[in-house]
Amino acid sequence: MAIPEFTMRQLLEAGVHFGHQSHRWNPKMAEYIFGARNNIHIIDLAQTVPLLHHALQAVSDTVARGGRILFVGTKRQAQDGVADAAKRSAQYFVNSRWLGGTLTNWKTISGSIKRLRHLDEVLNSGDANAYTKKERLTLQRERDKLDRSLGGIKDMGGLPDLMFVIDTNKEDIAIQEAQRLNIPVAAIVDTNCDPKGITYIVPGNDDAGRAISLYCDLIARAAIDGISRAQGESGIDVGASVQPVQEEIPAAAQPAGFQGLAGPRGVADDLKKLTGVSGAIEKKFNDLGIFHYWQLAELDHDTAHRIGEEVGLPSRADGWVAQAKAMTAEAE
């Protein structure tokens, strides 16, 4: 195996280049911003590509040395991707609320992990029958609560050697703890974030579901590459090289060729101003990740028609695109 390859086209299709509204930017990200379009900052992917490759190399090298990678992503749209990637690459993750002291107070966290293991043993053995139904329910709730916070790190056995983070603003406490312990941090840094203290900066959209899935997939594959290298260096016959399956990045329920947003960039546009769009249709647009006129204005004929079919009014699609272009032009 080798470091996973990716193209700028993949990044574009995943919406990695979309930053936040220009008035919400962090000036410290200026060097990574290509420009602005419709008041949305555009990230310079010419810099993202080599920086992401550098981060992937760091992950692979860390795992090849026997190190541990901790995936951290507690925002809703990152939770599943972070957990799946960590499990697939035999690494560790936190995808629920970050508990203060997870790294800096590892001794206490280890005690909680020990309690989680004990509860698993009790509830999965015949000993559970010694408790009343109410007591078993209480133990199960305690176990579930601990598992949400610690289930992804209960087998880590010590501090991680590198931490991969989605959304540095949301995970600022985790990053501070890593910095105090000199643990390298690789992170996706959006235009509203502060890159200070991040060891491996990867400028990119930290909100779009497809972008997050792409990051997690690449980091997982880099970790798997590190495992393969470690086995090879230790003399283990890993057999003939097998071309890894190129997984399609899930596009949720969105039409092909279109990348929606996980949420509006600032204040959502009133899509009901478009001809024939009711509140119900607007909700369908939102479910597809469409919140702004500029998203519709950029659609080609085929993609617009597919979206029209999704919301139940394909005959209106071209008209919506034309109206959206006019409204976007007026806003400029």
UniProtKB/Swiss-Prot annotation:
Signal peptide: none annotated. Keywords: Ribonucleoprotein, Ribosomal protein. GO terms for molecular function: structural constituent of ribosome. CDD domains: RPS2. GO terms for biological process: translation. GO terms for cellular component: cytosolic small ribosomal subunit. Coiled coil: none annotated. It comes from the Bacteria. Belongs to the universal ribosomal protein uS2 family. NCBIfam families: PRK12311.1 (NF008966), rpsB_bact (TIGR01011). HAMAP family: Ribosomal_uS2_B. This is Small ribosomal subunit protein uS2. The gene is rpsB.
